[in-house]
């Protein structure tokens, strides 16, 4: 019976929004000789490629962009799901309008562009804007740790859209993921149900309640590990697969 190591990307395999290091990339290819490996991220496929390499689908047995709403196995596309068909245009517009008006009322040291990114399986909402520089990203993240900007935004969204079948979770350093209930990272597990794995190990950094790794981390189908950085991920894997 085979095992699978399933990794979050940002903060687990790479530094947030940075490319994977050669050392980590090489380590994972060695690990692949001992176990199947997969990556699951909230980001879209292009961002996974940017960070893990254009050949990501050849390097991992499973690649699950957008929490597995887009799924690749052994280099081939398995399926693609979309949010607009599921929620309907009215709910999506209400959500976008509400988020833009909320962001317009927050005073931050800096605001940039791309406050909402529309993906296949989710909306990604960023108070500072996704086009901020790396320095601006870190500045916002440090401020957010003190002032809980995203936490308050999420609490507000949960109240405003209660009963609409939506989940709001804090993702990465600068944004909030919004998706239908059940479309969190656990969604990718449905592609693995009949694959016959004895154990699915999951590694992620945002495993606390409200973090976008929490649901899959606590799911009974996985054995979850909380990591703090790629080095930590490597250390745990070396312990599991000496």
From Swiss-Prot:
Alpha-D-mannose 1-phosphate binds at residues 17, 119, 130, 137, 175, 177. Keywords: Acetylation, Cytoplasm, Isomerase, Magnesium, Metal-binding. GO terms for cellular component: cilium; cytoplasm; cytosol; microtubule cytoskeleton; neuronal cell body; nucleoplasm. SUPFAM superfamilies: HAD-like. Homodimer. Belongs to the eukaryotic PMM family. This is Phosphomannomutase 2. It comes from Mus musculus (Mouse). The gene is Pmm2.
């Amino acid at each position: 019976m085979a095992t699978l190591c399933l990794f979050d990307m940002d903060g687990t395999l790479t530094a947030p929004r940075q490319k994977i290091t050669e050392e980590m990339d090489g380590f994972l290819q060695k690990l692949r000789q001992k176990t199947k490996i997969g990556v699951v991220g909230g980001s879209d496929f292009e961002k996974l490629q940017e960070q893990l390499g254009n050949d990501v689908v050849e390097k991992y047995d499973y690649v699950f962009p957008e929490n597995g709403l887009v799924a690749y196995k052994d280099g081939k596309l398995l399926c693609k799901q979309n949010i607009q068909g599921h929620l309907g245009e009215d709910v999506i517009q209400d959500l976008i309008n509400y988020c833009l008006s909320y962001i317009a009322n927050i005073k931050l040291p800096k605001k940039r562009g791309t406050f909402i990114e529309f993906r296949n399986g989710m909306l990604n909402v960023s108070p500072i804007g996704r086009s901020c520089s790396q320095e601006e990203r870190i500045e916002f993240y440090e401020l957010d740790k003190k002032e809980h900007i995203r936490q308050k935004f999420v609490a507000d969204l949960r109240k405003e859209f209660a009963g609409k079948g939506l989940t709001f979770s804090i993702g990465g350093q600068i944004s909030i993921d919004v998706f239908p209930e059940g479309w969190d990272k656990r969604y990718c597990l449905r592609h693995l149900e009949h694959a016959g794995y004895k154990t699915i190990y999951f590694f992620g950094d945002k495993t606390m309640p409200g973090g976008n790794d929490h649901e899959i981390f606590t799911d009974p189908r996985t054995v979850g590990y909380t990591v703090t950085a790629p080095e930590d991920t490597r250390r745990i894997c070396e312990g599991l697969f000496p």
